[in-house]
Each structure stands twice: as structure tokens, then as C-alpha cells.
């Protein structure tokens, strides 16, 4: 895939001067080399395109796609993502005033449209918008930085072609920076980095750049050098063009170019040489010129950076201060210069007519429609479904087919989003991100025009780690309460709703305390329902550690319809490298059990695994093998075999030596060094394992693995231990076996709650 991307990029640089990337839209060629190269790579003939659309229309669409960028802005919490997006919208003319994140002026940042986001100063939902820069359309998704809302990052990256990874020049590479970068790597996203907050006390961009190399394994180099730091930060020197830029005017809207300051000449040439060396390591064309000691021209270096970035072999590093309105315009230029257009990105679908055979999509408007629903929202006019179009065209009034459900749906309204505002459009084509109203579907569904039966590969959805019991205080609010839970569960795949079989309470599960607190607050605000909330619960799991046999006969033949079903086999733990949580294998030879009863047996075992006998939590990492059984010509039924399976599982479960698994969190602490001993001592009491300890100036950064069950109320405890100077972040790491004493305590608590010994 990387070679294909690099080939496309080289074709681009061979057939079209790079300076055309910055030409006004009217001066652009009718068919870009990037689009032509991508079409050739996918084997798309001009004849097939002409059959689908008028030649001029196809050329117009291709030109539009070549001048399009679909990007996300992601980072650790409080790194300045939304502030950066606000400046991008201002400089591109999408908004006419700059407002700050926390809404101190009563307005708040454009992309934080929820009241809760403006009050708390954090992004909770990803928000989409679009803008125009130098004749290019840039579609942007601003994502949350808090780990509890990681699904918003997952689904944004699933549909994007490029990304900006924002890093704090003071905090450096933090825990969520690592998580976000891992997500970008999973979805093979080319990216540029932006080291923000150069105006802050303690800013050190070179330290952060080196951290990205060591902690994120980035093959990177700076494309800019800052003119001053902290209070003396004035502007930037472009290492490609060898020009200095300062940002003047009340909001930094005037970019003034000048020569490189004389006192920076040596540093600039040193950093430019480093940039050329790093790019030469992954780009043959530049390496050849560099090894021959040829002078490297700006357009030559720019083309090499683009080839390497699109091929995901290099990450250019930009710098600035979004809050101080410095460095944003050059970053926008970098998005156009170095991140791919939709036709340079390879996207795959699964052909349902060919046993989910992997298909490379053409990525052009001339092909049949293929679009992915990646996000749902409840709008004022019904369900709002966000779509990324990979192939074809969608028009208002079209009939489209949901491949996952088989339903035919008419598109009543088609819009482009600008945060919480909408702009009606008549059509949208491949490469675009739009939204439709009135289309009932689930997140992850694929839509086509009916001529193909493709589904897009699914995104990664993490399992919830924490639960709460909730109930409406007023019985009259039950309807609205249920409506809220149904809506939120549909919109957010990491938000789950269930019923406690013992108490009958409604249980909501999510990614952490903040995640669940936000939903409880939204129920109160948006549905006017006050809810009673129980104590947070950890989502434990159960598993087995050894093989155990089962042989169970379920027999009921005392009047009425009889029941008869016998199942024999064994249960065993799945190998540690297995991705699945449950496997069922039918190893019966012959017809001891008629084949039509096998699905009922599997269903019975699955149902039994929903509640283990230790503490009533789901059982995972288990393989069930059916080896023999017996049936009755009259009394055997699906129900009989399902019940036989459930009882067989309960019969052999204890013999398989079950254990309890608990969620373990990766916790990163940053505290003044004077409090290091106190904080690490407290972590040891919480049964944390220290795995890292680094010094950053006057602060110590401690990384540890801690059971989630021991982390409740930690924010208050940390403030108390560090006089309010400590901070921490936490993300899910894995489920791990609890100690024997903890298991005994959990089992006894569970038995006491059920009134059993």
C-alpha cells in the first residue's frame, strides 16, 4: 500500500509542477495529475467514466477532489485543538470573530456547540466543518482529547485522509498523544504535527520533537524554526522557502514575510540540513540529489516532503501558538502541500456477494455510490447521519440502499455541517463528508445505489470499563428517561444500557466516570429528567484457566410437551493470542444431535457466558467444544437443547478453575518533584505497578498500571497530596487477573448481595 501511495505521489510530481497546488481555483488544469495517476492505479478507464457521466462533469469532479483535504485535529486534552480550529475558521473566513474555548465571553468556540462543552472547556463530541484556503476545500473534524471520549476519535479517523497531531510545547508527548497516534497508525493516516503553545513559560519545541521520535516512533523533522520562545515568541522561519514570517494585526491575520534574521542564519541552515537528511532517508529522489551534493531547491524539497508524508514515511513538524494567533496560516499551507487528496488514499470495501472479498474502491464520482455512516446525532429535524462518500454521487431525493439492513431509503435532505449549523446542498460526490436527515440506520452501516453490495470495514470499538445504576426520580419521567438512553446508546457505541437481573436496576456502562457523568447531565438538561445515580462499578469479567468436561442430560417427560436433550464435550480457555472472546466448535461425527439443534446449543452456551457463577459478570476468552450428545425423536426441541447447554455450562464451570479479571488502567502522573515520594507511595497502596519515571524540569512524570477499582476519587486525593499542583490522565490498558484475596472478597460480596452463603 505504501508503495502504491508513493507511486501516485511520484506521478504527481512528474506530471505537474508543484507550484500549481497554490494556484487560484480558476487557473487550475481541468484534470490534475494526482487524479489521473490515482485513476490509472485503480485501473479505471476513461470509457467507463464516460458511460457513467458526461466527460466535462467527470473532469470537474476530479478537479474538485484534487483540491480537497479531509483532515482531523487530534491531541491530548488541553493541547489546544479547538483553539487551533477556531483560528483556522477565522483565517479562512468561515467565522468573523474569534471566541475562546471556555466561553468566558458568553459565546465559546464555534466547534464546541454544546453548553456542557463550553462550561467545562473540553470537547465532548467530534464536530465537523469545512472551509476554503487558497482555492482548496478543507473538511475538518475536531475531536475530543479526553480518553473517555476516544470513540469520537476512532470514528473520525476512520473516514479521514489526513490529520494534524497537536502537541503541547510544555507538556510534550502525553498519554493521550500516544493513544491518538496509535489510532492514526491503525487507520494508516498520513499526518503533520503542530507543536502548540510556544508562548507558554517552559516551551521547548526541540524537546517535544525528540519525544515524538522516541515515544511515538515518528520519523520527523521540523519544517520551521521559531523566532524566540515564551514571551519573546515573535514568528517563524520556513526551512523550505528560507523566509521569516511574522503575524501582525489584531488577530494575527496579516502574515508579513522577510529575510531570515542574521542572528539565526546558522541555526536555520543546521535545521534545514537536518530536514533534508531525514527526508532523504525515505525518499530516493531527494537522497540522490543530497548524496551528489546538489543544491536542494525549495520546490524539490517540498515535493519530496509530500511524497514521504503521503506514503506515511515522514511527519513534518510545524510550530506556533494558536492562542496568540501565530503559525496557523503556514500550518494550513502545510495541509495543502503535504496531506493527500481523497484520490491518493486507498480505501477498501468488502463484497458481500463474494464472501466478503476485499475490494479496492476507485474513489471517483463515476463509480456506483458507496458511503459509510460514521456518526449519528439527534437533530431538531430528526436523526442526523454523517456520511463519508467513498465512491459515486449522492443527490437529494435519491433512493439509496442500506447494505447492512437491506432497506431502501429516500434521501429527503442533504446538508454540509459547520459545527451545529447546516447548509443545504443538492448533491455530494466521492471524497466529501456530508450529513443526511431522515435516514434510519446505525453507526457503521454502508449505503450504496443498489448496483453493488459492498460494506466498509468496521472501526475499532473499545469495551466499556465502568458502570452506574441510574433511575428516574419521578416515575412519570420513565418515558423520557428511556427515550434518552435509547438515543445515546444509538449515537455512541461505547455507551451501553443493560438491566441488573438481581435488582432490576438500569445499568449504564461507559469508558469512565466523566463519560457517564456527562450522559447523566445530558439526561437532566436535554430531557428534563432528574436521575438517581448509584456508586460507580467496575466492569469485571470472568474467565477459566483449565479444561473441564461436561455431560448433561436435560429431561422432562412428566406430562405435557416433553423436553429431551443431552450435550457432551468440554470447555477450555482460548489461547492468549486469540482475538475472540467466545468460540463454539461442533466436533460431533454423525447425527447424535440433528444439525438443526446445533444453533440452539451455541445460543445456550452464549447465554450462559453472560453471567459467570463467581460474581455474575460475563465470561470471556472461552472455547466450547461439542463432541457428543443424544436426542429424542419426539421430545427434543431447540428449547430443550438450549436449556441443556446452559445447565451443562453451570455444571462444569467450577471445575475449570474460574478467575475474575479486572480492568487495569495506564495512569500518567505529573507532579512537582517534591511530592514524588508521597504520590508513588500512594500508588503502591492502590496496588499500582510503577513502569516509568522521568524528570521534566521541576516535575516528575510517573507512569504506572493500576486496577481501576482502586482509582475512584483519585482526583481529590491527588489535589490533596500535591497542594493542587499535580495532574494525571488515565486510559484503559487491559483486563488482568485479580489476586486471590481480592477474588475471595468479590465473591463473598456477590453472595451476600444475593442472600446466599
Swiss-Prot record:
Domain tr-type G: 66-344
Signal sequence, renumbered to the chain: none
Cell compartment(s), UniProt: Mitochondrion
InterPro entries (UniProt xref): EFG_II, EFG_III, EFG_III/V, EFG_IV, EFG_V, EFG_V-like, EFTu-like_2, G_TR_CS
Pathway assigned in UniProt: Protein biosynthesis; polypeptide chain elongation
Gene Ontology CC annotation, any one: mitochondrion
SUPFAM superfamilies registered for this protein in UniProt: EF-G C-terminal domain-like (SSF54980), P-loop containing nucleoside triphosphate hydrolases (SSF52540), Ribosomal protein S5 domain 2-like (SSF54211), Translation proteins (SSF50447)
Function: Mitochondrial GTPase that catalyzes the GTP-dependent ribosomal translocation step during translation elongation. During this step, the ribosome changes from the pre-translocational (PRE) to the post-translocational (POST) state as the newly formed A-site-bound peptidyl-tRNA and P-site-bound deacylated tRNA move to the P and E sites, respectively. Catalyzes the coordinated movement of the two tRNA molecules, the mRNA and conformational changes in the ribosome.
NCBIfam families: EF-G, PRK12740.1-5, small_GTP
Protein name per its UniProtKB record: Elongation factor G, mitochondrial
